[in-house]
Amino acid sequence: MIDSFYIAWRYVAFNKIRTATLIACVTLIAILPLTLELLLTESEQQLLSRAESTPLLLGARGSALDLVMNGLYFDDEIPELVSMAAVNELEDSGLAMPIPLYVRFNARRFPIVGTTLDYFDFRGLTIEQGRQLALLGEAVIGAEVAGRLDIAAGDSLVSSPETVFDLAGIYPLKMPVVGVLKRSYTPDDLAVFVDVKTAWVVQGLVHGHEDLARSEDASVVIDRTDSNVVASARLVEYTEITEENVDSFHVHGEPDQYPLSAVIVIPNDDKSAAILRGRYQESERLHQLVVPGTVIDGLLANIFRIKNLLDAVIFIVAIATALALTLVFTLSIRLRQREFQTVFRIGGSRLTIVRLLVSEIAIIMAASAVLCGTALLAVDHYSSDLVRMLFIR
């Protein structure tokens, strides 16, 4: 049998292109369903663990899936916005603790998450380097952001404009990075956290500039009265918040009407949760209160229905590939009749021919198994990042 393996090995080594093609076909057919299973299992674990740890999520009426994906996984799809009035209403009810979220802007392709310090306690996030948020304009970044951008506490990060040509004249905000979070293996690793007021600064709702009442620049001040000062377009807003200008930052309009993308709602107990869900089921309400776990269950059900369809397609392709491989080996036997005749002449039997063919198939299957195993180990190692890239973000 060892002689048969040696002869088969020399044959497959000589016919490199044919052997490589057969190995590639077998490997692809084997690895596709296994990789899909690995990624879907990891995605289910990541999606459900985050969703089930979030009791309730408040947002504007519309797509519950968009709300959950933005509020929990910081997806780029921005849901309909709510206002700070929704947070105040929840606080006044005394039934839950609200945590506001404003996930709309980016900094070098990483989402800027405007929130409060309660969010870090809720998610169990701790600082590994530097300190926690303390002042307007400061940022704390996730471990993955720090690694990919090579940024540490003490560096700075600039917000990205929503469009290339920003006609609204909103300037990018330079944010000092005061802390780096300990790796949590969640979407929080890929986020830039700021105070919710800082997110409003990025949008231009809160801004700072020089004191017009003291300005003597005629090109900046158009008109001045005892009660009002009118500024021209030459008035430049600050693009960085420092100790010197932080007091000049102010709001325009009512803060209760300032936007949020979602509100995490942590009810006091099950009874409080039931009361709140009942209140927000009323049709005249402009807001919806969803259970993230239920929404993600629906998403996963759809994903696994698609997986079943893909499995059926892969199964059909596998059958077609097996038939094609059988045809290749059958034709190979016909083309190698002279070789087999030589084996017979030197005293070999039909069993020897069978051993040679079985050895060739075994070598091809073994090589395919090694490649498949190596690829699956790589997929398993990077499955968390792959799931975030393919399914979550």
Sequence positions of predicted segments:
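Short, membrane-interfacial amphipathic segments enriched in basic
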Residues: 1-6, 286, 351
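Hydrophobic alpha-helical transmembrane segments of multi-pass inner-membrane transport and secretion
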Residues: 14-43, 304-340, 362-378
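Hydrophobic, regular-secondary-structure patches
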Residues: 37-111, 118-121, 135, 252, ...
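Beta-strand-rich non-transmembrane domains
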Residues: 103-108, 129-140, 163-186
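Short beta-strand boundary microenvironments
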Residues: 109-157, 255
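Mechanotransmission and gating elements of multispan inner-membrane complexes involved in transport
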Residues: 171, 180-307
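Glycine/proline-centered hinge or cleavage motifs at structural transition points of membrane proteins
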Residues: 340-342, 347, 353
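Short juxtamembrane loops and helix-capping segments at transmembrane helix boundaries
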Residues: 379-393
